[in-house]
Design a protein with these regions (language model features):
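Positively charged n-region of N-terminal signal peptides that target proteins for export
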Residues: 1-5
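Amphipathic alpha-helical packing segments from all-alpha helical-bundle domains
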Residues: 139-147
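N-terminal targeting signals for Sec/Tat export/insertion, comprising classic cleavable signal peptides
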Residues: 28-56, 179
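Second-shell loop/turn segments in exported
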Residues: 25-32, 53-70, 123-134, 167-171
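Short, helix-capping/interhelical loops that line the mouth of catalytic, cofactor-
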Residues: 18-30, 81-139, 162-165, 191-197
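Domain-scale detector for complete catalytic domains at protein termini or as standalone homologs
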Residues: 13-15, 21, 29-32, 36, ...
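Short, contiguous alpha-helical
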Residues: 55-104, 146, 150-197
């Protein structure tokens, strides 16, 4: 499992400060690294799982691994559309975010605070199987990665919709949201009832 650069991402995010203008080399590197990390981790967690393992639920109302991946394939396009809506608006030089990059990262790590997703992001067989969900996730991630590598837009100077984050922080949040659900998959796989094969 590829985890080596997670501490580096965390450290450099802790050291960063929000500055208006195009992404700095450090900001770009951190964003790319986090996107790469979460995509690689997700693939690692679901690789070679059987149907029984993919469909196991810890409780009748909890999500299976397959449903978690489906949720990501449903949710990330919605979050990305919101990103693009905000990007289409002109920068706001006076906008100051009321949160930090670290808070965006911590959202993916801290599973003690549980939330309920919106109805439009609940997995309900929107994809025929896990492979289809994962393929859709990866296709959108390729678009995100291209933006992360090439964009010269001012993400710091743009507010995400009406929220307290700047647009760079929302980009981080999308990847951090995946991290959060990767942690959820690990919880499912660590459950005593999880099938051995």
């Amino acid at each position: 499992m590829r985890i080596a650069f997670a501490p580096v991402v965390a450290f450099t995010l802790l050291a960063s400060a929000a500055v208006a203008g195009p992404m700095t080399p450090g900001e770009r590197q951190r964003l790319i690294a986090h996107l790469e990390m979460t995509e690689a981790w997700l693939e690692d967690e679901v690789r070679n799982l059987s149907d029984a393992q993919l469909n196991f639920k810890m409780t009748p109302t909890s999500w299976s691994v397959e449903e978690v991946v489906m949720h990501l394939a449903i949710a990330e396009p919605q979050y990305w559309d919101q990103f693009k809506q905000s990007l289409a608006k002109p920068p706001q030089p006076d906008f100051k975010p009321q949160t930090t990059d670290v808070a965006m990262l911590w959202y993916g790590i801290d599973r003690t605070q549980r939330t309920t997703t919106g109805e439009a992001r609940v997995p309900r067989d929107q994809f025929p199987d896990m492979k289809s969900s994962l393929a859709s996730f990866k296709k959108l991630r390729a678009e995100m990665m291209k933006t992360a590598k090439e964009s010269q837009e001012d993400l710091r100077g743009r507010q995400f919709l009406t929220a307290s984050q700047d647009l760079y922080q929302w980009f981080l949040m999308i990847s951090s949201h995946s991290h959060r659900h990767i942690m959820q998959i690990r919880e499912v796989k660590a459950h005593k009832g999880f099938p051995k094969k």
